[in-house]
């Protein structure tokens, strides 16, 4: 390995990577992935599933309509299908049935799968105590696999969930990550029992787990870093044909190598769009496609749903921005004519525009999605506002909830009060200036870009390095993309793009000074020639 540049050494140090850990961090390998048996109850879950295979009982994988749920469902369906099992997939409908094992979704699952003997949940089920009991009363066995926080009572069945058993090494797995470990345990046991003698299934399943890990915004450290890095390395050779077809429709020109952005910004949002706008079943057909024709048709549909999602999102964002309350400690924006499936994205987009960033809730028809900046736990804020809510759930940075009838205004007031107290706990020193290093144009070389790539995969827990350049010269400012949603320009002569900020083109053109401080990330590009491009984060 060539000598690490001083700037890269500083980046590694800022991420807490010691000298002894640099090689492992820069070269994540499946050899360092912990064995599935270290995840409590994975053995019991695999035995229950193989018992159903041997008895030729019908198995239903009960998933979710988002990317994590779709990928987790596909992982277990692909695995069990390879064994010749009688297996079907079931995904609830977001708008009519809601998340997880609701009464309506369980009823439809039973109607569509008469004679089902075993239900295996993925990415849901940990809080479905009553519906698990209902299924058992009907003579249906249940295995719950999930990664969400449990309530006070666990379902009365085999449960595989790192949030329950607390194995530190697996604590940040997503639903598909849990399913991937279970699938590996299934294959090992099936081979030992003579139920499977075919080729390795690891490649396609790994790609699905890596995609879900990035899209579900899991920390990309430890086991997750290995999963995602190896999934990206194997994408071209092992990705399911549907994902490769979708990537060909979504990818930009000049891509040098696969990065976490391919998962987080190209594939993941498109798969999520199907569940948001129409049905997660459309995305599931994509990732389970076996032929090129089937894959291409499914990719066309999913890509079209993403276009629909963008149009709906843009209209909702414009309406939401018009309802912002200046200086409020939190924003609760009621959009009665919006689309519930896009509320979370719009909340995130609004939060990105806030300075300083504050928690944002977008409510559509009484159902809301919340997003919060670092340092504020939005789930805790919702809990403290619970008297105005029917239910809520989620994570520190993102959550969902339902508001009691006629209580949006009261909830807005209480939520803002709670967040004002939480915001005060985030001190200015913790926020910093958002820059990893201030650089000059001479620092921005291909060599630096190549070294930055070695820090991939970027995401939660391992953010992409943000550089700053003072007194940069801005030229050739112009809109980019469909309807001018993005902004293209040169910064000191270097090609640059500011995604999603086509709205400031005219403002920058009218600016009395074309010399500004610019924050950005760096990328390699082979479009036209091998060169460095900048991705703008902020112009000050």
Task: Identify the residue ranges that each predicted region occupies.
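Hydrophobic helix-and-loop "lid/oligomerization" segment in the mid-to-C-terminal part
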Residues: 2-117, 138-139, 188-413, 480
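Active-site cavity-forming subdomains of large catalytic enzyme subunits
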Residues: 107-176, 180-196
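Internal, well-ordered alpha-helical segments in soluble enzyme and binding-protein domains
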Residues: 128-131, 156, 174-178, 182, ...
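Mid-to-C-terminal polyanion-binding domains and interfaces
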Residues: 54-57, 294-334, 376, 383-540
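Structured core elements
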Residues: 60-61, 121, 131, 143-144, ...
């Amino acid at each position: 390995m060539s000598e690490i540049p001083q700037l890269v050494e500083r980046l590694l140090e800022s991420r807490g990577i010691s000298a002894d850990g640099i090689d492992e961090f820069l070269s994540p390998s499946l050899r360092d992935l912990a064995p599935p048996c270290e995840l409590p109850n994975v053995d019991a879950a695999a035995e229950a599933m193989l018992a159903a295979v041997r008895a030729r009982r019908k198995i239903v994988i009960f998933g979710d309509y988002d990317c994590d749920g779709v990928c987790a469902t596909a992982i277990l369906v692909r695995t069990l299908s390879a064994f010749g099992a009688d297996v079907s997939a079931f995904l609830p409908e977001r708008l009519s049935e809601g998340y997880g094992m609701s009464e309506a979704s369980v009823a439809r699952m039973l109607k569509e799968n008469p004679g089902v003997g075993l239900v295996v949940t993925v990415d849901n089920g940990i809080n479905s105590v009553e519906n698990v009991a209902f299924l058992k009363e009907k003579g249906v066995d249940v295995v719950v696999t999930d990664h969400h926080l449990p309530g006070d009572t666990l379902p009365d069945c085999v449960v595989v969930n790192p949030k329950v058993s607390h194995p530190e090494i697996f604590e940040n797995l997503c639903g598909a990550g849990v399913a991937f470990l279970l699938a590996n345990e299934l294959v090992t046991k099936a081979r030992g029992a003579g139920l499977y003698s075919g080729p390795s299934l690891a490649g396609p399943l790994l790609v699905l787990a890596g995609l879900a890990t990035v899209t579900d915004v899991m920390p990309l450290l430890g086991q997750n870093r290995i999963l995602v890095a190896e999934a990206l390395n194997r994408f071209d050779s092992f990705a399911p044909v549907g994902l490769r077809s979708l990537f060909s429709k979504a990818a930009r020109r000049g891509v040098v190598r696969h990065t976490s952005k391919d998962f987080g910004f190209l594939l993941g949002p498109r798969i999520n769009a199907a569940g948001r706008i129409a049905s997660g079943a459309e995305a599931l057909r994509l990732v389970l496609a076996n032929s090129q024709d089937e894959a291409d048709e499914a990719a066309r549909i999913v890509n079209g749903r993403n276009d629909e999602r963008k149009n709906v999102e843009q209209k909702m964002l414009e309406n939401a921005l018009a309802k912002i309350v200046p200086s409020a400690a939190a924003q609760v924006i009621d959009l009665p004519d919006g689309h519930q499936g896009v509320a979370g994205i719009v909340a995130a987009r609004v939060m990105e525009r806030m300075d300083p960033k504050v928690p944002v809730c977008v409510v559509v028809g009484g159902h809301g999605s919340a997003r919060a900046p670092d340092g504020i736990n939005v789930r805790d804020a919702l809990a403290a506002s619970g008297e105005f809510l029917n239910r809520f759930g989620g994570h520190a940075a993102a959550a969902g909830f339902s508001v009691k009838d006629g209580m949006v205004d009261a909830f807005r007031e209480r939520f803002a009060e709670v967040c004002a107290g939480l915001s005060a706990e985030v001190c200015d020193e913790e926020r910093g200036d958002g820059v990893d290093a201030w650089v000059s144009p001479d620092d921005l070389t291909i060599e630096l870009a190549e070294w930055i790539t070695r820090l991939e995969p970027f995401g939660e827990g391992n953010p992409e390095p943000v550089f700053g350049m003072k007194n940069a010269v801005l030229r050739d400012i112009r809109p980019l993309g469909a309807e001018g949603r993005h902004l293209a320009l040169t910064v000191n002569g270097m090609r640059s793009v500011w995604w999603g900020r086509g709205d400031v083109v005219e403002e920058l053109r009218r600016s009395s000074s074309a010399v500004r401080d610019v924050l950005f990330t760096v990328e390699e590009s082979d479009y036209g020639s091998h060169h460095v491009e900048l991705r703008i984060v902020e112009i000050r």
